[in-house]
């Protein structure tokens, strides 16, 4: 039987211990190089060391001034001064002056036997047992017990007066809880805690090809011999926001090892048993399934990742396959564990068993076992990511952890939570139903609407729960960590740092309750409903959370992004075809959600990613590629697999159609542009650009809208809330009306939901500004609470007011008419027969598609760029037309028309009605049922030829392969949003070539937006190491990785 050395040492001063005999040469730990100078002997992994008890040489004595006390033992007869170090380098020598240290050391130190002494030590270390180190008690009152695994083959202790019964069962793990690193590795900056998280982890020692055991880097002075098994983020050091006291170099070494493993591993595929899915997996989806399953079950400290496949490549099906595979494996594991005799792992404060029960579908709580099967063993030990622990718990003192663990055990263990935009909730439900065979059906709950359940136990009964970001925002625990420097814009600008970063401030907890209420909350752990400001979603311990269209949380400062981070889960996934939309900062929000250390803390993210990019963009982007390689899988439609495209789709042709203004439109635009430029210069001269940022965005918004139609600038149809709003306004005191008007006219009038200047702006009774389309998502039954952090105002139509209704009622009370006018002279553009240049271009395209024999139709409806300006009188009403396909067997040609502004869709709708074209519409003002009905009718009814879509509501997740022509009426700041809209039609299932027409106006702000889009495309391509075609432009080599991580 393997044995472990147990060494007891007192903490008295060195003067109290008599000097050791001459034969052991005394060394102190003050010389950290002594161990590195001593070569480590090779350990035979197949031999059991058997030693006989030996007595020390004559003259050697172990007596001390106190019975049973000796100096710490190094394993070779040498003694060292005990020094306990925290992960941040704190010295606890004085704190440990009265404690006894018990340590077990590996046999590589070649320890001679201890001298005899009195006393009896009976130590039993069962397999997987952990040392009961209580860090809540003073160090002076406890003994630190540590047990090394039997793989170190320690020699037995010498005979002493008394007996030493030492048992260390095979397969034992490190007994110490290394989530509180107490002993630094001698001669190395790394600590045990940097490479082992102790709780729930298997031994991180690997066997080489020749059978020789490979020590971890902390014992080999930084030499990485293999990719270590690393447990999940169960310890506080790995918890959300807990990386600042650690050395990020140690975490980066793990990232390097993971990236190296990905680089060296051949591409593998995985499939489900026949009959599990109703559709076969494509090869690239099999590769995605193998990669995702490996990411969840590997020992890397980030159980999950980012699936960043291009839109339309089947990320949804790959995710469904992952859910099914985990369920199948859990069922097999549960069945095999009942037949095999294994030793249970002691999982500290972990509900993995409950989650395994849920995944397997069994009502009997299976006991987690260590199986001889390698895959099953990994499944049992990994994934205990203890991401269950909320950010609040990271900041609480250790005394509260015991009650927190009790609280965790009360949480219902649920399956997979899928968070997605409201527009694709129904589609996820359909995919989960249609893509899974009858024999393998998953139980699915659409958690949406005002009548949804309030019982978290009911959520735990389903395999999959589908909900929206809005509901998560309101039901997630209302407590989170924030950077104090996030609002410290002046300091970051002053020192040349990016907004949201500070190099000397630490994270703090922002909680609505006071310290007293937090203390009361700790005691109230008997009921899951006792957690304050938390809905059912926040009271469940999820096995897996999947964020679909994860770019929704790209702004890490938003309440939505924070809420997703505070949910408890074992595995975490981000699905996004466009993970970077604006800046590299978009990635930080994903890293924080995924608990991807060390980049989950903004300070580390800034110093290790953003700073290198700013200093040397080429090397900086290569470093970013390596960081992403460990957690991200990305394939585009142009990616090659064995020399062939991963998917065969019809071609996509993108045409840029530049038209010109009419005379009246050009005159209007020039005056608006001159006024805007003059206003901007005034801000610049006064040095108030930053204070007037919202006003500057509004100036740009008006210029962009003028390119679509002048009436948009004049606030066409500017009172969206109508008579209900006016009736509610009349009940408000006059002072309240004035206050709300001032809020709408404020320079900070930015929509709280989309962070853009509001279209059809409205103000709520609580004083918050929204686009009408954005706030309607909350009014129409999804979640009627104001989404602004810590605002609990219930939203309804009678508490949302437009500017016109506020002013009209105010002017009526004063007995005078309102002097406020919505715009400039309306005489030209209010004519019913006026048609803007862009709308004319749209009608021309539809006209060409209605004539199958025309040249334009032969080119899939391509419309040549217009260079002739339209005159005011050049207005034609298009005769009623029917859209036909050049190939009768393919059916009618269907078109999607996108615009950012619902006002523009209103104007286009009027002209399409006059032309007699059957159409449907989808925007954010519609209920989910109405949206779903519009999509079905557009896809199924041959007579419906056109779909009008707002970019906000229609660019995410929808499957619109019935259309083969896409028209973009206006440009968005980042091109990825447009790409997402286009890929609603160009995706798996499309059988015809897709033509895209982007309509712009010459010599306007849109020319400059096009240039900005190209710059952003270049930035995204650099971050992913891709050329514009999607192929890899810069292949990282092993030498690249070593250089980037300074290994």
Curated annotation (Swiss-Prot):
Residues that, per the record, bind ATP: 309-316
Biased composition, class Acidic residues, residue ranges: 385-400
Cell location: Nucleus
Composition-biased stretches (Low complexity): 1-11
Main location: nucleus
Origin: domain of life: Eukaryota
Compositionally biased intervals (Basic residues): 511-523
Swiss-Prot/TrEMBL keywords: ATP-binding, Chromatin regulator, DNA-binding, Helicase, Hydrolase, Metal-binding, Nucleotide-binding, Nucleus, RNA-mediated gene silencing, Transcription, Transcription regulation, Zinc, Zinc-finger
An annotated GO cellular component: nucleus
Boundaries of every Helicase ATP-binding domain copy: 296-597
Ranges of biased composition (kind: Basic and acidic residues): 354-368
Region (Disordered): 1-89, 103-130, 145-174, 349-407, 511-533, 851-873
The EC number(s) this enzyme carries: 3.6.4.-
Record GO biological process: gene silencing by siRNA-directed DNA methylation
Compositionally biased intervals (Polar residues): 52-88, 118-128, 370-379, 851-868
CDD domains: DEXDc_SHPRH-like, RING-HC_CHR27-like, SF2_C_SNF
Family recorded in the similarity comment: Belongs to the SNF2/RAD54 helicase family. RAD16 subfamily.
Subunit structure: Interacts with SUVR2. Interacts with itself.
Protein name (record): Helicase-like transcription factor CHR27
Organism of origin: Arabidopsis thaliana (Mouse-ear cress)
